[in-house]
Amino acid sequence: MSAWAAASLSRAAARCLLARGPGVRAAPPRDPRPSHPEPRGCGAAPGRTLHFTAAVPAGHNKWSKVRHIKGPKDVERSRIFSKLCLNIRLAVKEGGPNPEHNSNLANILEVCRSKHMPKSTIETALKMEKSKDTYLLYEGRGPGGSSLLIEALSNSSHKCQADIRHILNKNGGVMAVGARHSFDKKGVIVVEVEDREKKAVNLERALEMAIEAGAEDVKETEDEEERNVFKFICDASSLHQVRKKLDSLGLCSVSCALEFIPNSKVQLAEPDLEQAAHLIQALSNHEDVIHVYDNIE
């Protein structure tokens, strides 16, 4: 088992054991499959797998509170649909418009339906398969030495890069090669906190299922509608296999995708936290940006 996976499951097990009290031992985690590193660097990334984050970090630390302050519901809903459309276009570009032969597209359409996205909006995004969009991954440094990865889909890579650079420079950040080293590409399965029989699943049980399914970690999170969910993290090559196993255990998976998970985190002082939140919000508001990852604790 990799050090990352062992440490992650150990932390999750510790959380469960603290809740259960002394004298109780958790089952040992199972070895995950070997990792396959992703290429690093900025610019176009051909063959990239679809990404959509259906959940956002939850918790009671300052970053969780500052990072995810939302605007009016109608504005937030429009933003979510806009990012979903980008993901549809990317999935179609990479695997074609037929969800029966494109598992990434099938996954994102499943998320669209769960968010009650209008059918007409979905169909419009599906018809843009002939657009000259390019997937882009930019590396940056934010306030306090934080690392940022910015995913984008654009038909003008030069303009998009100039825009991203301007937003970073204006808000205490900078383009910086090397930020990718602070993240690992992992499979992420988002699961409801109730199983198919509508019975609540606690973190202890989720940890047991993570071990059984071959996941490396499980975290309690909230989705963008502030509903509690679990995030199961696994090796990228095992994503669909782990999801299938979790479903067979009676869980209700909401989505699965590849995400950049930080392998090291930084703590920021209050002024840097606020500036980082403003920077990430500004980046996220750009029409070409799919998602912004950070390693802030």
Curated annotation (Swiss-Prot):
GO terms for cellular component: mitochondrion. One of its GO terms (biological process) is mitochondrial cytochrome c oxidase assembly. Keywords: Activator, Coiled coil, Leigh syndrome, Mitochondrion, Primary mitochondrial disease, Translation regulation. GO terms for molecular function: mitochondrial ribosome binding; mRNA binding; rRNA binding. It comes from the Eukaryota. Belongs to the TACO1 family. The keyword Coiled coil applies. SUPFAM superfamilies: YebC-like (SSF75625). Gene3D superfamilies: 1.10.10.200, 3.30.70.980. The lineage of its organism: Eukaryota, Metazoa, Chordata, Craniata, Vertebrata. Residues 20-45 are annotated as: Disordered. This is Translational activator of cytochrome c oxidase 1. It is linked to Mitochondrial complex IV deficiency, nuclear type 8: An autosomal recessive mitochondrial disorder characterized by slowly progressive cognitive dysfunction, dystonia or visual impairment that appear after an uneventful early childhood. Additional features include gait difficulties, spasticity, dysarthria, hypotonia, and variable intellectual disability. Brain imaging shows white matter abnormalities in the basal ganglia. Serum lactate levels are increased. Patient tissues show decreased levels and activity of mitochondrial respiratory complex IV. Acts as a translational activator of mitochondrially-encoded cytochrome c oxidase 1.
